[in-house]
Amino acid sequence: MEFAERRHAGCLIRVGREARGWRQSDLGMRLACSQSTVSRLEQGRSLDLPLLKQAADLVGVPGPLLNTSLGLSSSPAPTVVVDRTPAQEDPMRRRPLITAAALAVPLSLMTRLESALAATPEPSGAPARTLDARLAAARGQFDAAAHAGLLRSLPSLLADAHQGASETRRDLDYARLSSAYTIASQLLNKLGQYKQSRLTADRATLYADVSGSPLAAAAATRELAAVLRHQGQEAAAQAHIEAAVARVEATGLATEAQAAAFAQMLCSTAYTAAIAGDRDQALVMIREAARAARDLPDAAPAGRLFPITPAAVDLYAVGVHWALGDAGTALEAGRNLHADQFPTIERKGRMHTDLARAWWQRAKPDQTVGELLSAARLAPGEVRDRPAIRQIVDDLYAKHPHVSGVRELVAVTAA
């Protein structure tokens, strides 16, 4: 927040530009202006406010941060005051307040990450040799649905990954930086923070391309496609994911890790096609994914970038058929799935929420509640933190308040 508080809007633009790896001429090309104009913007010698706002949007400076730097914030940041009357403690009464907030993690953590995306923080000072372990720990937090903890650790992880890449300029360190942004994008997408997720996915893709690693590029592209789907850009998502499939296939699929990446990208292609309403493509791709995963182990080795398994493909099939509106087929695809087939809390919870969506699509509130309760008991964050799942809980309470378990679900989402 230092640049914002000191009214250095141009510095925010510069930091955001450099974080994307752009030169002033690169930003100028996107703004349809000259390099010298960009230079004046960054030095604070231009009064072109619309151009400044356009530049800020391109390089990912959050709007509130830019407004503060321009002195346009007329009031301090809002604070939350909790009225602790007995009625307020009833989760049913608290629910509208939670829904209005639309953010199930501490706002301070999200603001801190947004600031880190606008201006990369100073490195933490942790030894460079620990970065791989910290990336693994971050993936572990995501897998454990520990969303707040991961939000807390991401700013320093991104800062140190940036430092490593800038010091060595090695392909491996750019791949590590891409991985850090990929993890950030995964989390932000799950939390429904799609603008920030798009920014981090773009950066993950950029640094993966610099690294030359087809697997890092596939991971980044998968997240980019996911956020594009949420933004209603299904055609762009499909184009990105199909290009990534081709790049992975071009490796020759000589290793199990490459074969797993290929199966994962086919699953992502199938789901993207289903969201776009391309039934034929979706069904062909999910069948291809099942074939590609046929020889993969039932339990992926620890640390694998794409820990896809035959059961995981079946879970994707549930999502594909749900997206196509075929709830019965989705439930049939998931008939033999059980939580023990999935190694992480996040995946166990996701299995139950995906089945819940299918039951809800089939207008079966009792079964929907049962699956959501199973998810909440394993991974509360999968129910509490995901906007789409919270919406199902809201709808259950509005339409079926007397179904057994609804009050328990509301209490989980209001926690």
Predicted feature residues:
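Short C-terminal boundary/hinge segments that cap the last helix of small helical domains
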Residues: 61-75, 313
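Short alpha-helical DNA-recognition segment
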Residues: 20-40
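A short, Lys/Arg-rich alpha-helix, primarily the initiator
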Residues: 1-19
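N-terminal secretory signal peptides and thylakoid transit peptides that target proteins
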Residues: 77-104
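The alpha-helix within a helix-turn-helix
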Residues: 17, 28, 56
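DNA major-groove recognition helix of helix-turn-helix/homeodomain DNA-binding modules
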Residues: 49-65
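Conserved binding/catalytic microenvironments
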Residues: 121-415
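Residues within the helices of the helix-turn-helix
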Residues: 14, 25, 53, 95
